[in-house]
Curated annotation (Swiss-Prot):
Pfam families per UniProt: Ribosomal_L35p
One function term, GO molecular function aspect: structural constituent of ribosome
Keywords: Ribonucleoprotein, Ribosomal protein
GO cellular component: cytosolic large ribosomal subunit
PROSITE patterns reported in the protein's UniProt record: RIBOSOMAL_L35 (PS00936)
Name of the protein this chain belongs to: Large ribosomal subunit protein bL35
Gene3D superfamilies: 4.10.410.60
UniProt GO BP: translation
Family membership: Belongs to the bacterial ribosomal protein bL35 family.
Natural source organism: Christiangramia forsetii (strain DSM 17595 / CGMCC 1.15422 / KT0803) (Gramella forsetii)
Length: 65
C-alpha cells in the first residue's frame, strides 16, 4: 500500500512547533488594507496557534495522526 500524501494546502498553511503545537497565520492581511488601522494590521502580522477544537483536523490533513 502506498504512503499517505500530505494535503498540499495544509502543508503551505501550517507549521509544527518544537513542542508539537501547530502555528498558523492570521487572515485579512492581503488586500484592502487602507481602512484597517495600523494597530490591527500589526496584530494580524504575528502568527498564532491553532485552536484546540481544530487541532485534530489539521493533524489529520498533515498526516500526523
Amino acid at each position: 500500500m502506498p504512503k499517505m500524501k500530505t494535503k498540499s494546502s495544509a502543508k503551505k498553511r501550517f507549521k509544527l512547533t518544537g513542542t508539537g503545537k501547530i502555528k498558523r497565520k492570521h487572515a485579512f492581511k492581503s488586500h484592502i488594507l487602507t481602512k484597517k488601522s495600523k494597530k490591527r494590521k500589526l496584530a494580524l502580522t504575528h502568527s498564532t496557534l491553532v485552536h484546540d477544537a481544530d487541532k485534530d483536523n489539521v493533524k489529520l490533513q498533515l498526516r500526523l495522526k
